[in-house]
From Swiss-Prot:
Gene Ontology molecular function: any one: DNA-binding transcription factor activity, RNA polymerase II-specific
GO cellular component annotations of the record: chromatin; nucleus
An individual GO BP term: positive regulation of DNA-templated transcription
Phenotype when the gene is knocked out: Non-striated muscle cell fate specification defects whereby the number of vulval cells is doubled and the number of uterine cells is reduced due to the transformation of uterine cells into vulval cells.
InterPro entries on file: p53-like_TF_DNA-bd_sf (IPR008967), T-box_DNA-bd (IPR046360), T-box_sf (IPR036960), TF_T-box (IPR001699), TF_T-box_CS (IPR018186)
Protein name (record): T-box transcription factor mls-1
Localisation per UniProt entry: Nucleus
PANTHER family to which the protein is assigned, alphabetical: OPTOMOTOR-BLIND-RELATED-GENE-1, ISOFORM A, T-BOX PROTEIN-RELATED
UniProt DNA-binding residue ranges: 40-210
Positions of disulphide bridges: none
Lineage of producing organism: Eukaryota, Metazoa, Ecdysozoa, Nematoda, Chromadorea
């Protein structure tokens, strides 16, 4: 049975009429939200951020994380995120021009799903105590996903939106977004500079950085010459070969 991950289903409330009049920055004059790692986000944005999507779901990097201020410390709030398709167009990466270009109308979008932060609901004091990270949010291109992942269309452009909703009054919804978090959903990275920046800045890609063997010189018979690149990688790969040799000796 398909589950409903819409904002109204999550809040167990009926849809609110004229919702656009409720979700406005006029209602947020006391609440402030600041993007963490904004410098990193801008580096990606300047190149044209890409986010990998898979059928099973893939987490975002950079991770969306914000600092919230101006909440009532004793009131309870639900904090959630959805993705807004900001251009109803399909894009492709032009390698000749080194940029993304529109190729025509986009695919129809399903109603936006919400990713509810696992701490919800919580008092304002809790949300303001430390950065709020959405590191567990996953993106999928599976239109039939029933795991609560955010569904997107590949080669389409999206922007995350952070929603802060008072638990006792769901009509008091405050929405924030940041231009530098825009991205294009892809099933494989298109811009090699994005790939390099992801490897450089993602702590989970440390292994790729350490084991990168580009620049290792090969001699005429295919052996390694022991250049600087090999010397830096050897301490990392030696345990593997030592263990392999040990196993071979045991199996003799």
């Amino acid at each position: 049975m398909n589950r409903n991950f819409s904002i109204d289903a999550i809040l167990a409330r009926k849809p609110v009429e004229k919702r656009k009049q409720i979700i406005t920055k006029d209602n947020c004059k006391f609440i402030r939200v600041f993007l963490q790692s904004s410098n990193l986000w801008r580096r990606f944005h300047n190149l044209g951020t890409e986010m990998i999507v898979t059928k099973s779901g893939r987490r975002m990097f950079p991770t969306l994380s914000v600092i919230i201020a101006g909440l009532d410390p004793v009131k309870s709030y639900v904090v959630m995120v959805d993705l807004e398709c900001i251009e109803m167009k399909r894009f492709r990466y032009s390698f000749h021009q080194s940029k993304w270009i529109s190729t025509g109308p986009g695919e129809s979008e399903l109603p936006s799903r919400m990713f509810v932060h696992t701490d919800s609901p919580a008092r304002g004091a809790h949300w303001m105590r430390a950065p709020v990270s959405f590191d567990k949010m996953k993106l999928t291109n599976n239109q039939l996903d029933n795991n609560g992942h955010i569904i997107v269309n590949s080669m389409h452009k999206y922007r995350p939106r952070v929603h802060i909703i008072e638990q006792d009054d769901s009509q008091k919804r405050h929405t924030f977004s940041f231009e530098e978090t825009e991205f294009i959903a892809v099933t494989a990275y298109q811009n090699h500079r994005i790939t390099s920046l992801k490897i450089e800045s993602n702590p989970f890609a440390k292994g790729f950085r350490e084991c990168e063997v580009q620049g290792i010189e090969m001699n005429s018979v295919g052996g390694m010459t022991g250049g600087p690149a090999f010397q830096s990688v050897f301490p990392l790969i030696f345990p593997y070969f030592a263990n392999l040799a040990s196993n071979m000796n045991v199996n003799k």
